[in-house]
Amino acid sequence: MKKWNDVYQMVKNGDLDASLLKTGCENLKAARERATHVMEGFKESFGATEDTMVALCSAPGRTEICGNHTDHQHGRVLAAAVNLDFLACVALNGTSVVHFQSEGWPMTSVDLADLEVKEEEKETTASLIRGVLSKLHKAGYPVAGFDMYVTSTVLPGSGLSSSAACEVLIGTTGNHLFCQDKFDAVEIAKIGQAAENEYFGKPCGLMDQTASSVGDAVAIDFKDPSNPIVRSINADLTGLGLALCIIDCGADHAALTNEYASIPEEMSKVAAHFGKKVLREVKEEDLLADLAQVRKEAGDRAVLRALHFYADDRRAAEEADALERKDKEAFLNLVKESGRSSWELLQNITPAAAITHQDMAVALAVAEKALNGKGACRVHGGGFAGTIQAFVPVEDVCEFKKTMETMLSEGCCHVLSIRPAGGLIL
């Protein structure tokens, strides 16, 4: 923590450029201006002085590259942090209340005197704040009120996991303010996941939080979720001649919690037939050997979703290896296979019984046309709505973006890069 004016001058003078580069910024001048804007917003919102002790912190959104809905079954995933983030200025306020001012939104206030789950707070930012800080408190660290001014380029419903980025932001900040930075990135991810499951009320695996908290590209094996194996991958997409595009399909996934919840529920129902809790504990050959009975007990969709798990779990490991050895053809083929499996087996492209509106299916069909046999595309993240992902030859990216935005909507196609750092105190 340093005085507001000292940090402000450090940003303006370029003394924090090395930290800003870790956020994946492509324009240092713009990054400095954004950081000073956040500091000015903090000062104006909370009446801070130039001597107020502050810190700048950042947490990125994430992109899932392979392993669609495998994490909650203790499977393997390939994911990466991206250069869209939450950037915040924070200061202790001497009270028990957290004041969270997200730019352009009403203030969120959370009194830490009560750290119990609040039903009325579920699916709100307040629940994430209370949940993360409750976990730090239960770990034996005294938590206290702080003021935080936040700007975000990770929009809710964007498929880049804004909730996980918010959890990592609060976790990284709390770890710095109250825990002397004793928690590592994976531990912060676990805290965020617990907050989302228990306080926010949304079942989720650990992929989103781990990718955001650790940074760069990561291959994660959740066989032991209390101790996931995290392997950093040098995902040099530019070296492969590829650009990462995230396309907003035009439908909001914020109200689809039941659709998302049905996937882990049905996969776990298949596992339960074999006396297990998750599919990672069940051999695929055992499922195939008893397929008729499992279909009767769990239903056909559950069986198809289980078959997707086994295939995408293998693909996640193969795709990480392909990226590491810079095998472009193998990588793109695996992306295509993953996309087909999500559509045909996992069935998370269109909400159940949706006929008139199938936004994600249309977006995928348009992307296939725009790619014209080159590159690859797939559903991105939870599915049903939100975004799709495309890996596009760099020489075609401008034309691809133009085609997608002409056929879908202006501004729907975002060209991103992989961010080197995860949750970060600048």
Model-predicted regions and their roles:
Residues M1-R62, L87, A91-K122, A219-R378, ...:
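C-terminal nucleotide
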Residues G75-G94, V214:
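Structural signature of FAD isoalloxazine-binding scaffolds in flavoprotein oxidoreductases
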Residues H99-Q101, G145-S152, K182-A194, L332-E337, ...:
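Beta-strand segments within the central parallel beta-sheet cores of soluble alpha/beta enzyme folds
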